[in-house]
């Protein structure tokens, strides 16, 4: 479950698959999030397919908008690690992104103090304690160390993104083509020039 960091150490991209290094302990090319989503979606008769001749990954009938670095650029990205199949990460929008899922402590689980209605749900087991050291900067925390996202919550966002795309047609983030970015800059300059020139 590799995580891609942008130059400012913020997680904005979602790595779906890549060819593992020869000496890697983990030989699967697929991300943990993709494998969990695939297992869940199979029960909903939604298939994840990467055998498409174009090299795209499909969830059901929809193609994931993979980041295309062939031109060396993708939106604001230039000259970054472009290995594997990547999409932009569309976080769940909540006041506190660490609280978008139901969380149980191990004690609550063992003492059965909670309603154990786990049918048709994905359960991730992980550590959210500060001592775990598995925390990530996201666009939500803006460099504030005390608001970093635990790795297990980050995985929940990754899985949720794939499930919502496959089941609810939730749109994903993509970039405008290079030509449209240039057109927008020129249009803005022309507009400002006409208004204030």
PLM features per residue range, with description:
Residues 1-193:
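Flexible inter-domain connectors and hinge/loop segments
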